[in-house]
Every structure is written in structure tokens, then in C-alpha cells.
Amino acid sequence: MPPVSSNPPSAIRHPPSGRRLIVNADDFGRSHSINEAVIRAHREGILTTASLMVNEVACDEAVALARENPKLGVGLHLTLLCGKSALLPEKIPGLVNARGEFSNRPVGVGMRYFFKRSLREQLRAEIHAQFEKFRATGLPLDHVNGHLHLHLHPTVFRILVEDAASLGIQRLRLTRDCLSRSRRMAHGHWFYRVSHAAIYEWLSRRVRGPLQQHGIRHAQITFGLLQNARVDEEYILKLLPELPPGDSELYSHPSLDEFKHEFDALVSPRVKEQIGKLGIKLIRYQDL
């Protein structure tokens, strides 16, 4: 893999007058419904990138679809909880059960990964295995993020930064959303919004320095983090005029079943029309 660029993040390199937006779908490869939604949202709508779960049942289908749609930027959706492992259970017994499944309890997982030093080399091995599975697809690595944003967990992030050059990490999601904008664009779920905004702000503050030091690029802000699976047409229409200058990401989970409202939003003619009227440029992470 090529060495990580030493250039600073694009938000510094680009003039402040322009507004550029990455529109990403997480969980690519998790199911046929999600795969279909991702490809249709890319072909028919505003979706520019998707994050691949390399250990899930529909991964091969997702890779084939991505090859048929080379303008879709595909990144790695690193999975270290609520999913399956790349390595066999006997290789990482502290991370998974006998079926190779990570825990479904985010708080407990976060505490164990932070405090149990004995798990760090197992985490490193699993992280490298998932990157190797992505590399085997032959797809260019557009970006890296984590399932339930675990890529910014202090222990996981340290491994990613330490091994960035060998893993080929050049672009990564910064999990920072704006609570004040979120309050203007949607209502309710205040405990979720406030608590998650505080966590994401703390995480983003502590990783910005290392990201810049290692030349790992990122968007300035990621919208949709505080929506709790409600990135619908109404939210996006309110968001677009509020986009700050520079580079932003809109985070989504489109599918044709459970989250069809998010798919519908991404292919909405009203949304596409507003993007054109506002002069917002749709980009991929590799365009940063």
C-alpha cells in the first residue's frame, strides 16, 4: 500500500467559500437489502461512498456491485463489536465467542478494550485481518470508519494511527456533529442527542492532532450522528442550507426494508434539486 500522505486535511487546503459533501452509507455488505439500497442510492441519488463490512454474509455481493460502479468510493467499516470476526475464535478468544461473534454490548466492550491490556495484540491482529480482507477485494480504500464508531475508541485509534502506513490509512471519519444545528433541524430524543454530542466532541478533540500529524485526512464535521437512524428527507432538506464552508460528511444507513426512509431521502428529487440550487459539490473521501 502507498505511504500515508503528509499533507494536512483538505479543510485547510481548500478555499473556505466552497461547500463539498460526502454522502456515505454504513453497513455495506451486511445484507442484500442494504446492498441494493446503496447501489440504487448511488446510481439514482446523491450517495457517493459506502463503508464495507468485510466479515458479513453479503460482502461478496457488495464487492461485485462496487466493481460494477467504480465511481462509488468504498471504505472499510471496521467491526469490533456487534458482528463477526475475520480471524478464527481460537486466535482472538478475548474478543469473540466460540462462534466468532463479538459482543453486542457497546459499553462493556469499550471498557474491556480500554482496561484489558492483554486484548491489545488480539485487537491489532483482528484489525490487520480485516484490512487484509478489504485489500483482497482489489477495491481502492476510499476511507476508514468503525461500526458504532469504535474506530475512535482510544485503544483502537492508537493501533490505527501506529499502523497507518502499513494499513494504507489515508482518510478516516471524524465523528463530530453539531448539537446546535441538530436542535434546529430535528426535535426530540434530547438525552440521546446531548449525550452522544458530548462523547463525539470529546473523541474528535483528542484525535485531531494525531490525524494531522500522520497526514490522515477527514471531513470537518459528520452530520446525522445525532439523528439515531432518522436521516430522512425532512432532515436533509433542512441540513443542506446549513452546511458550513469546506468539507462535510452526511452519514446514513439506507436499506430497502428497515431504513427505507433513509434510502428514500437519498434518492429524493427535492434533495437533488436543492443540492444543485445551493451549488453543493458531492465528493468522495478520496477527493479530499
Language model features: what each stretch is:
Residues P2-I22, H32-H143, P154-L288:
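Terminal accessory/targeting
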Residues A25-F28:
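DG-centered beta-turn motif at the end of beta-strands
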Residues H151:
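Alpha-helical and His/Cys-centered functional microenvironments
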Residues N145-L148:
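Active-site histidine-anchored catalytic micro-motif
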